[in-house]
UniProtKB/Swiss-Prot annotation:
Could be a nuclease involved in processing of the 5'-end of pre-16S rRNA. Pfam families: RuvX (PF03652). One of its GO terms (molecular function) is nuclease activity. GO terms for cellular component: cytosol. It comes from Sphingopyxis alaskensis (strain DSM 13593 / LMG 18877 / RB2256) (Sphingomonas alaskensis). This is Putative pre-16S rRNA nuclease. Keywords: Cytoplasm, Hydrolase, Nuclease, Ribosome biogenesis. Disulfide bonds: none annotated. Its EC number is 3.1.-.-. GO terms for biological process: rRNA 5'-end processing. It comes from the Bacteria.
Length: 152
């Protein structure tokens, strides 16, 4: 099941269990995880993309190792809310996650990377460290937005 509605996604999830947030780029996939009570999201890691089968294997290992029950995938919309070419590729990526057998929430990721980068600059994180952590931190920002919407 793939949806853009947080209530539908929440209804498809078992009670409890961790969620994973994904910030899908052309070169990397930023990964974040939340606690089983859906209170807070934390950056986890960045997967360097190769081919989709390798990406799927890495995500299968994550799902199994972290007991993930649902995925929140950042959806890159244009500023006016319309689809962009990246939106279509992200929707295709989400459809290709079907072998994982998990519900998928496509969540608006507008401003996520910019907000995270501003926070890192304000915290005086070096440019090298920002580059290392930006994708997983953006995934945490996306995931936190989704869990906040589900637990209101």
């Amino acid at each position: 099941m793939i949806t853009t509605a947080a209530p539908d996604f929440a209804a498809a999830l078992p009670n409890g269990g961790r969620l994973a947030g994904l910030d899908v780029g052309t070169k990397t996939i930023g990964v974040a995880l939340c606690d089983a009570g859906w209170s807070f999201a934390s950056p986890d890691k960045t997967i360097v993309r190769k081919r989709f089968s390798a990406d799927l294997d890495a995500l299968k290992a994550l799902v199994a190792g972290q007991a993930v029950v649902g995925l929140v995938v950042g959806l890159p919309l244009n500023m006016d809310g319309s689809d962009s070419p990246r939106t279509q590729s992200t929707r295709a990526f989400a459809r290709n996650l079907a072998p994982l057998g998990l519900p998928v929430l496509l969540w608006d990721e507008r401003w996520s990377t910019a907000a995270v980068e501003r926070a890192m600059i304000a915290a005086d994180v070096s440019r090298a460290k920002r580059a290392e952590r930006i994708d997983s931190a953006a995934a945490a920002f996306i995931l936190q937005g989704a869990i906040d919407a589900m637990t209101r």
